[in-house]
Amino acid sequence: MNEAVSPGALSTLFTDARTHNGWRETPVSDETLRELYALMKWGPTSANCSPARIVFIRTVEGKERLRPALSSGNLQKTLTAPVTAIVAWDSEFYERLPLLFPHGDARSWFTSSPQLAEETAFRNSSMQAAYLIVACRALGLDTGPMSGFDRQYVDDAFFAGSTLKSNLLINIGYGDSSKLYARLPRLSFEEACGLL
């Protein structure tokens, strides 16, 4: 049976973690990005489908390529973040299922239903984006996830001619706490949950 993590870990991962809009100039190494993926890839997905594909943008050139897709409110925070991750989903994720889910012919579940394939890829890549955020926090990094961008532009600029489609962006780095907004409320258990 698993043991609960420490209260300090819960604070780091959830209750004290914040969405950051400003960044310190401390770089994030490529090795750290590899560590992030090594953690997040173990999060569960439907039939182990693992549809997320991530582009970690670390260079000025990469950020300039992304710039036209950003909403005005997300521009400065993204250009100054050490890393911006494009979390995309592979519309043909099912081609990897013989490796990832060898227990049966899971590939045919999705080749026979394009709608199911798209819903599965989008939903599960969203879950994987959340795992990436938690992995960042576990390694001492801060994040700023965003959906305010031109997805079609990103798809054309970064994924043209491929089977990838963008889902969301996540800025990653070491946050500047002086630029945090006041903590916003969350819904109570009674407002968000039910018991049957």
Curated annotation (Swiss-Prot):
Its cofactor is FMN. It catalyses: 3-hydroxypropanoate + NADP(+) = 3-oxopropanoate + NADPH + H(+). It holds the Pfam family Nitroreductase. Its EC number is 1.1.1.298. One of its GO terms (biological process) is uracil catabolic process. One of its GO terms (molecular function) is 3-hydroxypropionate dehydrogenase (NADP+) activity. It comes from the Bacteria. InterPro entries: Nitroreductase, Nitroreductase-like, Nitroreductase_HadB/RutE, RutE-like. Keywords: Flavoprotein, FMN, NAD, NADP, Oxidoreductase. Induction: Up-regulated by the nitrogen regulatory protein C (NtrC also called GlnG) and repressed by RutR. May reduce toxic product malonic semialdehyde to 3-hydroxypropionic acid, which is excreted. Belongs to the nitroreductase family. HadB/RutE subfamily. This is Probable malonic semialdehyde reductase RutE.
